[in-house]
Amino acid sequence: MATPFFHVDFEQPNEMRFNRARVRRAFIHIGQRHMRDARRLVMRRGRSEPGENPGYQSGRLAKSIGFMVPRASKNRPGFMTRIAPNQRNGQGNRLITGDFYPAFLFYGVRGGAKRRRSHHRGASGGSGWRLAPRNNFMVETLKINSPWTRYYLARELRLSLKPEKRR
């Protein structure tokens, strides 16, 4: 007795059409969402404690956070998003002039924190920090948005691949 065998054959198009504009729009949307969430993390008013996200006083840090999707070139397809404070050529940001303030927040400042004449912060003369390091809010934003970013980018890549129309 012969084994049952069923075979369906169909022609598959050789070429797939890739919609670059759709993928670039997806990266722009990802940049906008990450920028929004990073700004929300630093918008809490009031004084911040060491290890917390930076507090909001003048709004310069929050307004400086921007994103950029680079243009495509012969060496680079342009499928990436840069999100950072003081992002050059960034969209939706105002640059911070002077010293790079986010670096002071991340690394902290010890200079000028020695015990001086006005050492009434405690018996030891303070903590040794003029500005203690704060939380890295950009890394926290990336962690929060990581599952959504993967899902959204995979969906847009899938939808941007279409088979070429036969004529």
What do the predicted segments below correspond to?
Residues M1-R94, F100-R167:
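Short, Lys/Arg-rich flexible segments
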